[in-house]
Amino acid sequence: MSTIIGLFTEMLPAGGVQRAGRHVAAVAAKFAAERGFAYRFLSLNDPPGPHTVRVGPAEFLFSGYARNKPQFGLAALRAAGRQPLLVIALHPHLAPVVAMMRLRSGKLRSIVFAHGLEVWQPLGWLRGTALRSADLVIAPSRDTAQHLVSEQQIRTGRIRRLAWGLDPEFEARLRASVPPSRPADFPERARVILTVGRWDPADRYKGADTLISALPRVLRTVPDAVLVLVGEGEDRPRLEQLARDSGVANHIHFLFGLKQEELFACYAHCDVFALPSRGEGFGLVFLEAMACAKPAIGGAHGGTPDVIEDGVTGLLVPHGDAALLSSALESLLADPSRACEMGARGRERVQADYTFEQFQTGLSHAMEDVLIRQH
């Protein structure tokens, strides 16, 4: 039976790339079932053995390889010897595995996803050559697409822009008639600035430290302002120390280990969402905040300007500029009507452009187009 193969870095943990992987796998599994194909999904960094994942009403299976690169590579090569039709790789770093699979099966078509920061610099000979050999490279934003051309020398005809969409579970919560209750430890009677991310040293580009540095100035005009940071990571002690050094520790809350319904409630009960990153390839968290009718503040870099329309659905600020960030926060916290209008515009934009159904349609068309080239 003809098979669609999926290669993933990781799917089970929280995180934007992980969630994107789940979305791609769900769409690919549905695409295969509707056409009488089989599918085989492999994940390099997830725990060993078989796993079942649900995305909305759909379920799919995949095998984890616990960071064992030789076993993962051998499994991919074995899959390439069993009537493979199409291989989809969720990260440019997996492109060399795709290239090896295509050496074994000359008719195998390929799609590789790029995200953002990882393609801002040349990938090196092996990964770069493998990426350039893909039939199609999918980018979530104009910025990522431009870096694929300028830094990776991918021909524009082999690049397709496809924005991510909201998670079906998140969409279902938006349709619920009963508003979510305030999460435990979420501040009450305060103007809440929310940010969501993974707080590891490698993720400092997301700008959590700039948010903390901007808070003292915000408090001068909005004394009941509070910053809520949702997420885990090894950089949390450094951020907590920065909060103490800045004299704002009493105005900062770290929340971690939240369930999806608790994260949704954080969006629903905040006043402003902010992630002043310099390197977002897209930023799924912006979609989630905007879907909950919250104004979003992001970095004026990377793929963020594709999502946030400056002055309409939110505000864009230069990465690392605490003064401009504090001004943006003050302007929205001190003017609830403006914030409400931006939030409403953001929700309209998400409903118009960023649903899971739209992502599913776009990826299905991309797979069809690549397979047509085979004939």
Specify the residue positions occupied by each region the protein language model found.
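A short, well-ordered alpha-helix in the C-terminal region of glycosyltransferases
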Residues: 324, 331, 338-353, 359-362
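Short hydrophobic beta-strand element within catalytic cores of glycosyltransferases
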Residues: 295-298, 308
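Conserved acidic donor-binding segment of nucleotide-sugar-dependent glycosyltransferases
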Residues: 310-311, 315-322, 331-337
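Conserved donor-binding/catalytic core segment of Leloir-type glycosyltransferases
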Residues: 185-206, 212-215
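Aromatic "clamp/platform" in nucleotide-sugar-dependent glycosyltransferases that forms part
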Residues: 278
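Short alpha-helical donor nucleotide-sugar binding micro-motif in glycosyltransferases
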Residues: 131, 257-258, 265-270
